[in-house]
Amino acid sequence: YNGCRITDCRSGEIIYSKYLPNDVAAPLLEIVKKYPGIDILAYTDTELISGGDTNEYSEKESFINHMPITKVDDFVSYVTKNNNNKFLITGEPELIQEVKAEAEKQFHSYLSIYCSDPFFLEIMPQGIDKAHSLTKLLTSIGLSTDAMICCGDGYNDLAMIETAGLGVAMENAQPLVKESADYITKSNDEDGVLHVINEFMR
């Protein structure tokens, strides 16, 4: 959830969670519906909820998270019954930029809106990113950011890479992410994270 939720991997307990205001779902869906081929996704613990036009990028998100897509007729009613850490808007990059411009104009004062990839537009509570939540986690266990190594490849990883004592970009990372990193490792397909562990943690 890009920093909106911290879960204890041993117990499954949610340590920290921040949610979107429910009243943003309807106006966001209105924006999405203006553009053919654009989808909006919400997340449960087991599935992705689709309110727009399911596309190849929604399928990509489904594959990445090992979660099926469930298409619902009334997206707003469905998602406002639950707490939502984030929405993801997916589609062709040029259309995503148009959606982004509209969303920023309407919600800039209380949402965080950015592209994690050219085809993924993240809609988050304001002030939330991976660095924010990792800093909270470090504080809870008595460590500083100097002790943290972060690996990433997308725009949504920038803040944590810049905050970490050692910020690492994958070889397949976006150019700006590479520019911001202290170290560039091998690609995801070449076990780049394992390379970092072997290089810096043994």
Where on the chain are the PLM-derived regions?
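Conserved strand-loop elements at the edges of beta-sheets that form or border functional pockets
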Residues: 8, 115, 187
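Conserved acidic, metal-coordinating active-site core of Asp-based
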Residues: 27, 31-34, 38-151
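Mg2+-dependent phosphoryl-transfer enzymes with acidic/Ser/Thr/Gly-rich catalytic loops
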Residues: 122-202
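A short acidic, helix-capping loop that chelates divalent metal ions and anchors anionic groups
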Residues: 7, 14-15, 120-122, 177
